[in-house]
């Protein structure tokens, strides 16, 4: 009688443990480089995949010198509209989240940084210069 009772207990314990682990799925992606349309699309698809798989959150490891404003805005909008919490982790050691990366990090549900990483320099940069006011 002790063996069947122990077997039932073991089965229940395994079932409960698998339910706990199934509820704690976490997505992970890495973004390393300039922010552009491909990055915005990649992040948007990853958020949709995390939602479809009922993940607890999506972790984005970020290392970027910045990028395009339009792509940054799309990423921020996808974070703000996401039913899945987004965690931005600036890493590895020595990584940066400057310019567009700063805005992306600050828009996340949770922002975290590895030791010796940097964030900042968040201002628009003109690539083509300003048109002249006339001939001189």
Model-found features: residue ranges?
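Positively charged n-region of N-terminal signal peptides that target proteins for export
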Residues: 1-7
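Bacterial N-terminal signal peptides
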Residues: 7-17
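Soluble extramembrane regions of membrane proteins in the secretory/endomembrane system
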Residues: 20-136
